[in-house]
Amino acid sequence: MAHDPAADSATADEPPVLPTDRHTGCPFDPPAGLTALSDRPVRRLRYADGHVGRLVTGHAEARAVLADPRFSSRYELLHLPMPMEGAPGELPPAPVGDIIGLDAPEHTRYRRLLAGRFTVRRMRQLTSRIERFTTDCLDAMEQAGPTADLVEAFARPVPTLVICELLGVPYADRGRFLGLVEVIFDQAAGAGARDEAYAGLLRYVGELVLAKRAEPTDDLLSDLAAPGPASDSGDLAASGLSDEELAGIGGLLLAAGLDTTANMLGLGVFALLVNPGQLDALRADPDLAGAAAEELLRYLSVADPLLRSALEDVEVAGELIRAGETVTVSVQAANRDPHRFPEPGRLDIRRRATGHLSFGHGPHQCLGQQLARVEMTVALPALLARFPALRLAVPPEEVPLRERSSVYGVVSLPVAWGEEQR
């Protein structure tokens, strides 16, 4: 029989709030308070506005929630588990083209249009270009050395170049969109600033869509924006998407495609540098790059949490989640579930880490996950091969962290390599 929290007595323990403080302990570990709450896979949680919903920390339970259509992704149904500066009491519906905040059938329509363009085969076809971008960044870094901020010199430029190439965004325009993306993910920025940044990104991509329709090139935006036979007015592309939808989808792909991978690369190199045994193993055997990428994705879990709303009463792990309750799925906790990953707090690049939830699960699983995998698999061994003596230029505790961002990572990563570089 499911446990019904509504039947609890008035003297029941007050539900905890979501722990987010990483100030103490290892910068790669979940907050200590979150680990303490992971003794039960599903528990009650108090949200920033006072709503009482659920926290899911178990790996199997997280997969079940993320795959179940009885849990909605619609923003207007959700409550925020942590306070965000200036966030409204009630969230508005997803903007046009934002497929993350939609359910079927709207989400299914967008997903079908895009999924075929992000297959494993198509992403692997980009490998040679990713290798070229990586080499160019390493050349520039080496010439400017022997010290660098790895974020500015490598972790951010590589995925920016790649997503620009894929979408058809001029890399020379990065000054127009990089700052906007930073604000969009900044939880400490006011709601007005985030909204203004998002609107600015949509304006930029909207201008690009019109340019692509007039003069198409070989890229994803041109493909999606190509006019249909009955769309002389430009109201609908052959893909069936309006200009507003194209701008929303393009903005989402641009922001997600560069920010998450950039933070994975920066934080991933940081994790390797403070785990020299793992770093040496990867340097000695570049064929471990694929397994290393999966393990770093599991170990670091930079995009967390994922939110859902129960559309009806649902039982998960013997707990009855009531219709209308928001469910916070902690990717960090699920990826450290010892029932799924033995010794989960240990970085082990030889581990079989497939099955982690860093790209989500179910119908909203990340479209760009194969691209991120290829980028990491190419970039990490190339960096270590180029700079055999790569090391932190500051003590680990002095590396600044992005603790108030929706995507966790390092603000900067000062590194040096010295005379042993090739």
Which residue stretches match the model-derived regions?
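Cytochrome P450
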Residues: 1-422
